[in-house]
């Protein structure tokens, strides 16, 4: 499956559920305690990270989406730390505060990148506290396209049926990261994302692929669900829907380092992609790629859009530079822009590459960090130049251009002008050689409307492809 990332910045997602603080104490271990046969950790590093539903929200924000967050917290230092943590990552929380219970905290003691001990500080929330959280979250449904219920069975989502019904009435898709043996509480949701262990708690032991699909279909019918994505560790993911064949997506993890928060990453990537307009198979493939990235990190972590783009480029077998397709270039260009690189673009036939071309391309490249050369296809050159042109096929022209040190990407276009492809790629600077006026350069108005610049560069006098061809013909 060819995966295309949507415009994540269009995604508006509400996250409701069990929020918690993941706290890490880390340091070296060099001796055993004289008090008991346990290692002594000399703590040198303290770190707090938002976890649970809070991690889902910041994953959405890190991808570029807009996330609102609702959860239950105590009136304590941990709640303050959690608030600071989510705000620092672009998420504004809407807490339901309870005075007699602590904010859920998971304290991990780490040494040499290994977890030695985990301490949990928590008390389950009551039905009344859960109902209050869900009720205060209803007003947010008018502002979003997707809602996520992140259930860690801590009590924030005891009975979410009325919330799901309200979301459905407003056309908001509800995605659930479920917990527990009773999936009936999620009746009417759009999608559930259980892992294999959670799935088997509900349906019993899965004996085969066919058995998995059949049991998932049974849950879809029983609880009026649209789809289910079962995450299966090293076996990847399986998407089951009511009206389509199952879709198996193989794992893309390069190395499993820590699975903490992997489920949060899956549902956050799913929600962001769906809210941004991806169809369900595409969204699942994006989530699978994101999960493969996050399990290679230590602790509760997030995935950036740039990491996704780079991972997708590798999975598509793309080197990132040279002669590329338009879609490949769109990926590469987004990486460059996220790195803060200034991208220059030019275009032409470049039929017989000569010293004038080389000098011009060197000038263009000197104006930025990366240079795109859009090249007319053979059919386009023939329409513009007439019979007998091009002398060199587009493959050969692109190969020669891509070999120049000044050129980063070469991409073909089939139209008579490059206006469409320039309008799609929108470089920071569009350059054209010759005696053009800026206002007459194809694609120039679109580049300037997007905040870019347009510049005319001079060619070396007396050097042209036409003159070279005429000289060859005269000497035959």
Curated annotation (Swiss-Prot):
One Gene Ontology molecular-function label: heptose-1-phosphate adenylyltransferase activity
Described purpose of this protein according to its UniProt entry: Catalyzes the ADP transfer from ATP to D-glycero-beta-D-manno-heptose 1-phosphate, yielding ADP-D-glycero-beta-D-manno-heptose.
Family affiliation: In the N-terminal section; belongs to the carbohydrate kinase PfkB family.
Catalytic activity: D-glycero-beta-D-manno-heptose 7-phosphate + ATP = D-glycero-beta-D-manno-heptose 1,7-bisphosphate + ADP + H(+); D-glycero-beta-D-manno-heptose 1-phosphate + ATP + H(+) = ADP-D-glycero-beta-D-manno-heptose + diphosphate
Annotated coiled-coil segments of the chain: none
GO terms under biological process: ADP-L-glycero-beta-D-manno-heptose biosynthetic process
An example Gene Ontology CC term for this record: cytosol
Biochemical pathway: Nucleotide-sugar biosynthesis; ADP-L-glycero-beta-D-manno-heptose biosynthesis; ADP-L-glycero-beta-D-manno-heptose from D-glycero-beta-D-manno-heptose 7-phosphate: step 1/4; Nucleotide-sugar biosynthesis; ADP-L-glycero-beta-D-manno-heptose biosynthesis; ADP-L-glycero-beta-D-manno-heptose from D-glycero-beta-D-manno-heptose 7-phosphate: step 3/4
Lineage per the UniProt record: Bacteria, Pseudomonadati, Pseudomonadota, Gammaproteobacteria, Alteromonadales
Source species: Shewanella pealeana (strain ATCC 700345 / ANG-SQ1)
Protein name: Bifunctional protein HldE
Keyword tags: ATP-binding, Carbohydrate metabolism, Kinase, Multifunctional enzyme, Nucleotide-binding, Nucleotidyltransferase, Transferase
Oligomer and partners: Homodimer.
